[in-house]
Amino acid sequence: MSNSSKKHFDLPYRPGVGMMILNADNHIFVGKRIDTKISAWQMPQGGIVPGETPSIAAMREMLEEIGSDKGYIIAESKFWYSYDVPSFLIPKLWNGNFRGQQQRWFLIRFTGNNEDININTSNPEFDQWRWASLDELLSIIIPFKRKLYQAVVKEFESLIQ
């Protein structure tokens, strides 16, 4: 059976990491995805390369997506969080091999300044970026990731206040 004929729920999750990156004011980095016509804001995330630890993947992805690795890990999520992408997106993402992602999340303190951030990387994922408050984060996030973001916020919230 080819991946294109598999049912959505039969596909595995792609292993990955997500980063809740905080500035000195405890605002959260969000980027607007470059590959969609809708206003799709999200926190940086990415895959784990085979043999790579989640924490190493998080710092690599931070550099790849925001152009800076100026920061340090405050906390790692206790759980792996997962989300499913809408079925119409499956053939367009990851060669149709995954139903969504299962991610370890990291709370990262950004130690640089705004001038250190460069989203015009070799493989850009965002065309805009900004710092969002914890209160506004869930209202601007792409809907199919909202439940995952709620869980991540709940886990890290006491460390942000």
Curated annotation (Swiss-Prot):
Top EC class of this enzyme: hydrolase
An example GO BP is: mRNA catabolic process
Determine the domain of life of the protein's source. Bacteria
Q: Which EC numbers does the record give?
A: 3.6.1.-
UniProt short sequence motif Nudix box, positions renumbered to this chain: 46-67
Q: Which UniProt keywords apply?
A: Hydrolase, Metal-binding
Which GO molecular function entries does the Swiss-Prot or TrEMBL record give? metal ion binding; mRNA 5'-diphosphatase activity
* Domain spans labelled Nudix hydrolase: 12-154
> What is an example of a Pfam family matching this protein?
NUDIX
Could you state one GO cellular component term attached to this entry? cytoplasm
- Cofactors: a divalent metal cation
NCBIfam families registered for this protein in UniProt? PRK00714.1-3, PRK00714.1-5
Name the family: Belongs to the Nudix hydrolase family. RppH subfamily.
User: What is the recorded function of this protein according to its Swiss-Prot or TrEMBL entry?
Assistant: Accelerates the degradation of transcripts by removing pyrophosphate from the 5'-end of triphosphorylated RNA, leading to a more labile monophosphorylated state that can stimulate subsequent ribonuclease cleavage.
Q: Which PANTHER family match?
A: M7GPPPN-MRNA HYDROLASE
Output this protein's name: RNA pyrophosphohydrolase
